[in-house]
Amino acid sequence: MKALFVGLGSIGQRHLRNLRELKGESVDILAWRARGLNRVVTNILEVESGADLQSRYGLRLVPTLEAGLSENPDVTFICNPSSLHVPVALAALGAGSHVFVEKPLSNNMNNVDALIAEAERAGLVGYLGSQFRFHPAVKCLQQSL
């Protein structure tokens, strides 16, 4: 399995650690980080500046989103700023990758319909991260819709 991470802030690193814990070294992890910062954010939200992300997480940094997508990831974890979620998800789906998009899906509704249509057209899974999916209020809302 090959996973591409777009954005390695605290939530991106949390998802990366979770994936490593679940799948171990069987996952080839690529990552693109636009700012190129070398900061590790620990589980208790401590920041280690100057840390080597590649050796810490056993990943390979790619220079651009396009370079990462050209490696045919099975899944792309989209953890960059919200305003970039939809364009990155569309690019990943277009490259044949399933997508996990961190919440919120976007900062506006532009192209959300296109994103849903592209996932359906390509037969790929598009998943939006949500920690409240089993909350009683959310369940009630789902039933009423």
Residue positions per predicted region:
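N-terminal Rossmann-like dinucleotide-binding module
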Residues: 1-54
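A structural signal for short, well-ordered beta-strand elements
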Residues: 4, 61-62, 130
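Short hydrophobic "strand-cap" motifs at the C-terminus of beta-strands
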Residues: 6, 102, 129
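Short beta->alpha connector loops
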Residues: 9-11, 81-84, 106, 132-134
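Short, well-ordered alpha-helices that flank and scaffold nucleotide-derived cofactor binding pockets
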Residues: 13, 17-21, 90, 94, ...
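A short helix->loop->beta-strand "cap" motif at the edges of active sites that frequently abuts
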Residues: 26-27, 95-97, 122-125
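Beta-loop-alpha module in the N-terminal Rossmann-like domain of NAD(P)-dependent dehydrogenases
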Residues: 54-118
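A contiguous active-site-proximal alpha/beta segment in oxidoreductase catalytic domains
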Residues: 106-145
